[in-house]
Amino acid sequence: VGSEMCIRDRMDDSDYIARHLVTIPCTIVAAPSVIQRYGTPSRIQQFEELPCITTVNALKGAPWQFVNKKGGFETIKVNGRYRVNSGEMAGRAAISGVGFAILSKQACQPYIDDGRLIEIEFEQSAAPLQLFALYSDRRYLPAKTRALIDFMHQRLSH
């Protein structure tokens, strides 16, 4: 028995059908201690040398993506010496001073507001996180699964 649906970022080479659910804005942050130790980077290419927190699932772990002026993506292979398996763990590591991180803007905003994290802005913004409902076959998708996908799309897009 296989699963009927999963929620994740887009799979590039997949036989699954992907329905976009939500776009989550992201930002680059670091703890004040990291900024004190390494300074504030002025170019995204500096992340190739600076300590960065990467997420195992996102872009297969190492590269970070930024949106360029033309709306396309620029990928930087960062110095990802600390890898985690969730955005929550990346946030905790960033607050602890492990390194620079790309996090969901909404999730880290309280820590930016209270000074535990510093947001670092560049001409190229961090690529947003895209979440999709993935399922194998539209024709045989059970009604309850289709209803769940429709509900999530409606709730997350508002």
Whereabouts are the PLM-identified features?
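C-terminal regulatory
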Residues: 11-131, 157-158
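Short, small-residue-biased leader/transition segments that mark boundaries at the very start
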Residues: 1-7
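A bilobed periplasmic-binding-protein/Venus flytrap-type ligand-binding module shared by bacterial periplasmic
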Residues: 131-140
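Short amphipathic alpha-helical coupling segments at ligand-binding clamshell hinges
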Residues: 104, 140-152
